[in-house]
Structure formats: C-alpha cells, structure tokens
C-alpha cells in the first residue's frame, strides 16, 4: 500500500512499481469501457440506452423521453432500498465492502483499502453521479475512505460530481445537489 514506491513518468509514458506491488486495472477498466460504449451508441444515433457494467451505470433518455430510475440498495440488507434516483444522461457508480469481502475469524475484511491504515475502509457505501462513468467510478473508490465532513468538502469542490456517503455508524452525508436526483428517500 505504499504509493510512494510508484513512479509515474509522463514524459516517458511509463509507470514503475516495486517488485512486491501490482496495479490492478480491473477497478476502472469497466467504467472506461462503459464510456466507450456510450460514445459508440451516441455516434450511431442511439440515445435511448441504459448501460450497466458491474457497479457502473450510464443512462440516457429512455424511449418515453423520461429519466431512468436507479435504486441504491441498503448496504446492510440488500432486500431494502435506500434511494430511488432519477438519472438522465448521467452515470452512477456505487462502492462498498458489503458484497466484496473475506471473512476471517468472524471479521469481514472489504476490498477497498484505506491508504492511511493499510486495512479495509469502514464506510458502508459511497455513490457518485457524474456525466462520465470513468469519473464516477474513480471518485466512488477514491473518496470511499473519507470522513463524512471531508467527503462533503471534497465532492462539492469538484465539477460534475454529486454523491452520498454512508459511514460505519450509518450516518448519511450528501453533496450539495444530490437531493436533485432523489425520487424517493427510504432512509427517513
């Protein structure tokens, strides 16, 4: 987890890492692919589409010229919903440790690692909305380990991002305009 051992050379277009490290691109390649598919469909004059690739979803207008409805599930109980969102020409990416973890001696260890501790992050869920699947995916992982207050400050400072963070105490933190996407809020 020592990012300081990663050397990036823009001039040489190379990345060097320590022999004990690896960079796994699967975390963002799917969202990059979703943006490529969206661009292809758009160039083919297909604007009525919903593209779902794992935890990244891109929406266009549906055939009734209405927004798409997207559900964010409760990270502790997937039979319950937290939000019903309305999205049009946007992407949403949801990150969390609820579905991707390993259990050791009764303790669940998630796949999103805190760069500060080297251990799995404790937040329950983070969802990010953007016009780009790649951007929403990268930020939903990148902001995952932030505290609620730091999350709000950071996400509100970046153009074309809205989101919601649910911490380990199940406290909910919204970006400034996230509420504009909410059709139903089941957390009340």
Each model region followed by its residue ranges:
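Mature catalytic core of soluble alpha/beta enzymes
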Residues: 1-188
């Amino acid at each position: 987890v020592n990012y300081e051992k990663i050397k990036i050379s823009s001039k040489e277009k190379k990345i060097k890492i320590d022999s004990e490290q690896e960079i796994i691109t699967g975390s963002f390649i799917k969202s990059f692919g979703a943006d490529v598919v969206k661009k292809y469909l758009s160039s083919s004059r297909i604007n009525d589409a919903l593209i779902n690739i794992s935890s990244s979803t891109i929406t266009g207008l549906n055939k009734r010229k209405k927004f798409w409805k997207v559900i964010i599930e409760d990270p502790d109980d997937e039979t319950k919903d937290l939000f019903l969102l309305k999205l049009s020409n946007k992407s949403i990416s949801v990150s969390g440790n609820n579905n991707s973890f390993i259990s050791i001696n009764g303790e669940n260890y998630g796949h999103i690692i805190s760069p500060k501790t080297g251990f799995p992050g404790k937040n329950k869920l983070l969802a990010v909305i953007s016009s780009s699947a790649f951007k929403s995916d990268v930020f939903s992982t990148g902001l995952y380990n932030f505290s609620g207050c730091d999350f709000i400050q950071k996400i509100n400072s970046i153009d074309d991002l809205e989101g919601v963070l649910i911490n380990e105490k199940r406290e909910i933190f919204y970006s400034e305009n996230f509420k504009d996407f909410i059709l139903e809020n089941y957390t009340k």
